């Protein structure tokens, strides 16, 4: 082994050691989000008539992709790295409907429909108007402040999307199955939040331990029960 090979091996060893140390000094937060809807079958026997509805898992598919799971009130020691996200205009919809990014991130808005769109927001966190632009064109905006930004199309009133801008990187959007895992978090006690624009939010107190895994489960009612 020559000196170059030895130097490369030493560098790889340092990188592996740093990665191992980082993993040992942070913890994993993972879990599930379950959305429930109202069953139309009555609860109880026929002798007492209909007394309400029983919640059951909702086959809502992508609705879980409209949930944001995050640690609440966390102040990182350094500003989080900005991200690059994309919200596509396709089929007269914004895809995805919900996006979460860190402060300072840039979001691209490509138009994949064969007609014009005009993306805008009147949210105080970030007000903008991208103007009308045709198919195949993309425009972007940065998001320097934390908060919730609601996005619309000035041409197609049914189109809407939501961007949650956070001051730290410890957040995620669950998979369609409802499973989620946050980026590795420093040890400590936190409030974990599962948020949905229409449903509201649920909170859980959790403890993150170095090198450990903290699990949480949320159940959110996606539909109101019908009398």
What are these regions (language model features)?
Residues 24-227:
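Extracytoplasmic copper-binding redox domains, predominantly the cupredoxin/blue-copper superfamily
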Residues 9-20:
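Bacterial N-terminal signal peptides
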Residues 1-11:
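Bacterial N-terminal signal peptides that target proteins for export
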